[in-house]
A protein has these predicted regions:
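Short conserved micro-motifs at the rims of enzyme active sites and ligand-binding pockets
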Residues: 1-3, 7, 106-108, 253, ...
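Non-catalytic, usually N-terminal nucleic-acid engagement modules in DNA/RNA processing proteins
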Residues: 2-125
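Short secondary-structure junctions
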Residues: 61-66, 141, 379-383
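Short, hydrophobic-rich beta-strand element in sensory/regulatory alpha-beta domains
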Residues: 66-69, 144, 387
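Catalytic cores of enzyme domains
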Residues: 78, 114-115, 120-304, 308-320
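Short glycine/proline-enriched loop/turn "hinge" motifs that connect secondary-structure elements
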Residues: 85-90, 185-192, 415
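Residues that flank catalytic or metal-binding motifs in active/ligand-binding sites
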Residues: 91, 194, 296, 386, ...
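Feature captures hydrophobic
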Residues: 320-467
Length: 467
């Protein structure tokens, strides 16, 4: 048992700088056996200086299929800096690791096979990242590896839970380009890759060669394959992808839990949720969360190691890879009144539509306006124009301008131009109205909500953001 410090023992302040040229004063821990053992070793070796090529060789030796490093000061990573430094103060370099997936497994209409490959490749990549991180730490540089996917910082949910954006780092490190399906396409491995990122205090000499072409072929097969129409030539419909493909992740589980809570009996619950849906959610909770589609990755022919068969037999690629996914009879999860619902009914009438509640629920008024581009539906916004001003007060205050322009959306976090409709209330009140927890009519009658302009336009605006 270590003896307690004597009452008159002076405990040094670790933050107090020592005058230059003065010897370290004996501390209260110097007599400890571990401290004596450390002192006996002598001074530590200076940290190793890493070149980019040597670091890449280390990553490949640890099991990565490709790797590259990029400075945290890279201009494309400015939004990552705050989050990275919070996780590892002193970070100078981000090391992106690439793990290849088996294309045939990802392409299987049996999605259990595809999900097994996602999970296998993800776990393997996390192990690789751990080995590289330990090697860098042993060379004298603090290093850590955030998860390839999960766990995340869920106390921040529904905000940013990830420590670093692997996709942004991969693009900045010249390991690929972002495709229209919003996944990174590697020049060799195509879309069949998973990504991980190391944070390290090491400063790397040199950098990766520039990627001078876009691996995307422009074939648009990802657009054709998406069951909810989330991918368009001029944009990506985030909410459509999130509500279906990620149904068995965070928000989908919360929606199911609320459905259980809302059901007055077991019989009522069975009428709302099928046995297969309940069993599928159980499977994701018991093992790892499963994607409902990811067909955009499955059909992508890009990448030198993947492209050959597509170039030689395009009809066979359509017959053997694309068509089985298009023809598959399955449940597709959509929000009522969304563009995704209309897309499934028109494009895939043989697929079963399952209407669910929107799983994107902003926690504040500011978050509400910031999330609008993610939940906006073009269909209900076509054929009319209007400008809305919102002045929300109280603890959850926010000011915003929302413009609907014949299927397009513009959001500014200040008041701009002359409004057709002007809304004033507390931020908390408006959130409750948006979430249908408060009647807007009663809010007007009680003076909690003041609206100037054509109130019918507010109903049209609400239809653009179905919940």
């Amino acid at each position: 048992v270590n003896p307690p410090l004597a009452p008159d023992t002076e405990v040094p302040d670790p933050t107090e700088p020592r005058a230059e040229g003065t010897a370290a004063r004996p501390g209260p821990y110097d007599a400890h056996p571990s401290a004596r053992a450390v002192r006996a070793r002598g001074p530590a070796a200076p940290p190793r200086r890493w070149t980019h090529d040597a670091l890449r060789e280390l990553a490949l030796a640890c099991g990565a299929d490709d790797a590259a490093a990029v400075s945290l000061d890279h201009p494309e990573l400015a939004d990552e800096r705050e989050h990275v430094l919070r996780a590892l103060p002193g970070t100078r370099t981000l090391v992106c690791l690439v793990g290849r997936m088996h294309p045939d497994s990802v392409r299987s209409p049996a999605r259990s096979v595809a999900n097994l490959e996602f999970h296998r490749a993800g776990q393997a990549l996390d192990e690789v990242a751990h080995r590289v991180s330990v090697a860098l730490s042993e060379s004298g540089h603090r290093s850590l590896n955030p998860a390839m996917a999960f766990p995340m910082e869920m106390d921040a949910f529904p905000g940013r839970g990830w420590i670093v954006s692997h996709k942004r780092v991969a693009v900045a490190a010249q390991l690929g380009r972002m495709g229209i399906h919003r996944s990174v396409i590697h020049p060799r491995f195509g879309s069949f890759v998973l990504l991980a990122t190391l944070l390290t205090t090491a400063e790397i000499d040199g950098g990766p060669p520039p990627l001078e072409f876009d691996p995307c072929l422009g074939c648009r097969l990802c657009i054709a394959a998406c069951p909810v129409g989330a991918i368009e030539p001029d944009g990506f419909r985030f909410s459509a992808c999130y509500d279906h493909n990620y149904r068995e992740f965070m928000s989908g589980f919360a929606d199911l839990a609320e459905t259980i809570a809302d059901s007055p009996s077991a019989l009522s619950l069975r009428e709302r949720v099928s046995q297969s849906e309940m069993a599928s959610m159980w499977q994701s909770l018991s093992y790892k969360p499963n994607y409902k589609a990811a067909y955009c990755l499955a059909v992508c022919p890009a990448g030198e190691d993947v492209l050959g068969p597509f170039l030689e037999r395009r009809a066979a690629h359509t017959r053997d890879v694309v068509k089985p996914l298009l023809d598959k009879e399955e449940t597709v999860y959509v929000v009522a009144g969304s563009d995704a619902e209309a897309h499934v009914q028109k494009r895939f009438p043989h697929k079963k539509v399952r209407v669910v509640r929107s799983s994107l629920r902003p926690p504040s008024a500011v978050a509400l306006f910031r999330s609008m581009p993610l939940t906006f539906q073009r269909g209900p916004a076509k054929g009319w124009k209007a400008r809305f001003h919102f002045e929300l007060g109280g603890e959850d205050a926010a000011r915003a301008t929302v413009v609907i322009d014949d299927g397009a959306l513009h959001v500014a976090h200040e008041l701009e131009g002359e409004a057709d409709v002007h809304v004033r209330c507390e931020g908390r009140v408006w959130l409750e109205i948006v979430e249908k927890r408060r009647s807007p009519v009663l809010a007007v009658l009680t003076g909690r909500l003041r609206v100037r302009g054509d109130r019918a336009l507010l109903s049209k605006l609400a239809a653009c953001f179905p919940r």
